[in-house]
Amino acid sequence: MQIFNTLTRQKEEFVPQVPGEYRIYVCGPTVYNYIHIGNARPLIVFDTLRRYLEYRGNKVFYVSNITDIDDKLIKKGQEEGTSMKEVAQRFEAEYLKDAAGLNCKKPTVQPRATEHIQQILDIVKDLIDSGHAYVAKNGDVYFRVKSDPEYGKLSHLKLDDLESGNRELRSQMDDDLKEDPADFAVWKAAKPGEPAWESPYGMGRPGWHIECSAMSRTHLGKTIDLHCGGQDLIFPHHENEIAQSECANGCTFARYWMHNGFINVDNQKMSKSLHNFFTVRDVADVYGYEPIRSFMLTAGYRMPLNYTVDLIESCKNSLERLYTCRENLDFALTKDTFGTDETLKEKAAEARTKFCTAMDDDLNTPDALAAVFDLVKEINTLSAVSSKDALQTAAAAFDEITGVLGLLYNRKKDEVPAEVTELVEKRAAAKKAKDWATADAIRAQLTELGWAVKDTAQGPQLSKL
């Protein structure tokens, strides 16, 4: 499999340190509110990557954190008159509900930042001892950016350009607490009304960037195979993670980096100020979760993706085609007689090959979806004449590749009441006797009972309305 490595800006063969075992870290949410559809993209994209790696027989150690201490969380708690902890616990539960609704597998480990304070302080000490960090006069601890000659290698930004062109950095000198405006906090001195922990530098709390470094090192080791997140995290978050991790550990932090593109709304950047801000829960309440997952797979993960109501409705309709196809396969396999055509075996093998070729090419989910719908077309064309073995082969391939994409997870088999079965049999008898009036009347009865009947070459097929 080849992936686009942000570090080198090119596609590379994705080779883990240990053959058959991938160690992956994905930046998780800051749980101060419901996640929006932009937050859902990395959640779905990298869950799909994990599923594919596992499908190909690999073991994946997948860590995705919960940021439960942050300026936004503190501010939210102050606005509500509650605590940061209460806010974090409430919205972590809502996040997990959304993640489950989107059919994202649970991480191997899902660490919280507040549970890793000692590990954070261990890295802070390593940085100070090696001269890469210093304690400011107020008790803040800053990373000394100029001590790292490789700083900027992920974002491909030069430190001199950052300092001269970034007003925000210049404004962060904070009364000469920093040696350099580009230096960033790895530990923040306590402020009144904010949560704080004991440290050798006085009461305080961790900086944002060091939380992920500590959780990654604790659960995956000093060098991981892949670090993932949204493009907005490349700088400063991921750049700073690399700097502090590699300076503390003395080795490569992450061998590969993957970043997903932004979500726009009606071709405009999603933002609260433009009133085009949608939470996952907002969209799911109207369309369900599964169309959101399907939508995220319709474009290459590195490309910007434009959210519109028309597109999400189109995804919902496409999912209905998939569900209908699978129901038709189930129906065909329940019949007593089958055809003799074996073509579907060949078409199922072709679909698997096309699917894997697409996924091996930097997680090309649009082409992978195309392979799924090519198989749907063949199933719809050939199921009436296919052998039982060919139908079973097609069903297995269909389930495999839709499962890797995390789709069709709401599939359920409706129990058919005896009354409905009896009416279907009576209707079939009426049709055989060419008693069309009775057949139509029974169809109307079935509709009133909440069932639709479709006449096929294999016989009448029922579906719940």
Language-model segments: which ranges?
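N-terminal, positively charged nucleic-acid-binding surface of large information/translation enzymes
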Residues: 8-13, 17-105, 458-462
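The substrate-binding groove and active-site-proximal loops of carbohydrate-active enzymes
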Residues: 78-84, 108-114, 230
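Alpha-helical recognition segments enriched in aromatics with Gly/Pro capping
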Residues: 1-32, 47, 97, 118-330
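Short phosphate-binding/catalytic loops that engage adenosine nucleotides
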Residues: 58, 132, 451
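Short, glycine/charge-rich beta-strand/loop segments that flank catalytic centers
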Residues: 66-70, 92-95, 105-120, 138-147
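Structural preference for alpha-helix termini/caps and helix-kink/transition segments
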Residues: 269-270, 277-465
